[in-house]
Amino acid sequence: MAISEASKSSHELPVTTAESSGKKATAKKLTLIPLVFLIYFEVAGGPFGEEPAVQAAGPLLAILGFLIFPFIWSIPEALITAELSTAFPGNGGFVIWAHRAFGSFVGSMMGSLKFLSGVINVASFPVLCVTYLDKLFPVLESGWPRNVCIFASTVVLSFLNYTGLAIVGYAAVVLGLVSLSPFLVMSAMAIPKIKPHRWGSLGTKKKDWNLYFNTLFWNLNFWDNVSTLAGEVDEPQKTFPLALLIAVIFTCVAYLIPLFAVTGAVSVDQSRWENGFHAEAAEMIAGKWLKIWIEIGAVLSSIGLFEAQLSSSAYQLEGMAELGFLPKFFGVRSKWFNTPWVGILISALMSLGLSYMNFTDIISSANFLYTLGMFLEFASFIWLRRKLPQLKRPYRVPLKIPGLVVMCLIPSAFLVLILVFATKIVYLICGVMTIGAIGWYFLINYFRKTKIFEFNEVIDDLDNNVNGEHPKVDDHNS
């Protein structure tokens, strides 16, 4: 399709940053190393949470999963994120991509599905944190002490996010290094005890494929979430591809080394491989001191995961407000810290309400909604190559459209498995949320037409925007 033939909606999306909005321009704060660790915490945060893959399918399939899955999922998703984030470096992220490809309805659906999956994912981290803490403090296993701990941790960590992305970025560096250090010690101490034949075990005959695939997916996805922070990055065209490359390698190594070490050194009943088992394995390998160290690392990792995911969700809401998909007040920033406090508050409150769900249902629901969003993302990526071939892309995936189709079809097959193996409660939760996302689009249009809320209006001409020039946002009602 020729660029001049691209259809235009009534409020075509631009790529906006703080500089192109009505806000006072501020210096971008994310440089390479903090961005690498934010991506790392968007995706992984360490080997915490990989244990159920062994419980579901045995050591061999767990190892193969973490070896192969990055090639069929993580790398393609990271490549797409690198190309589109550098072509459209704004806080709208994947919302911009979907809208530019297919229009406002698809852009709105993409934003809603990814936001809902994001806040559900945020809800899982206080739960994971308390799951490790209750091994040190059994009183947190259930009842009101556990609920109070989840509530308090959510409030405190949300306030940390409010203090600024620069603080969150550098905190992620420290949290990442400290939380990984006990695993390096454990892996080194496990070497004399490793028996390689244990790696070939298939475990029990009955496999829990739902748990297996959801564990792999949950531990190795969300690479594109960092796209909602693109407007806050120094030189995103250069920084994003390099940061994603480093993060992919770093994340895969962080999963595989402890997995090889523990499955090779420890022989236990497969049912014991549940969330938190790495801490028990550390005690078997080196003693209680290492178990405590890993549990402390798990808490720190959960903090990093929470901060990174909450940042993405909050800045996504700000980006959608900048682009006219949400009322302007969603993009309000703090006068003290220049952070999108409304986005942080809404994301934190929603995640708090969801954090009392069953942990497995939390993961499965986040994966299901994310899967629906990824189908839209793959389609948007390919269609933008066809629709806007002359668009300036500082980083371009080195494939033509047929190759891109194949690259996207392989992970799409895995997405189908996620949908097929979902449970009834997950279908129910995600069905209601998807219907709600459709209704939200029409409700927002009603608000815009009746001027109940104030929206940004964006005037964009794709014919004059193929070289990466980003039109301004008119700061008035649409």
From Swiss-Prot:
Pfam families xref list: AA_permease_2 (PF13520)
GO cellular component: plasma membrane
Protein's membrane topology: Multi-pass membrane protein
Entry keyword Disulfide bond: no
One GO process term, biological-process aspect: polyamine transport
Keywords: Cell membrane, Membrane, Symport, Transmembrane, Transmembrane helix, Transport
Purpose of the protein: Probable cell membrane polyamine/proton symporter involved in the polyamine uptake in cells.
Family affiliation: Belongs to the amino acid-polyamine-organocation (APC) superfamily. Polyamine:cation symporter (PHS) (TC 2.A.3.12) family.
Name under which the protein is recorded: Probable polyamine transporter At3g13620
Organism (species): Arabidopsis thaliana (Mouse-ear cress)
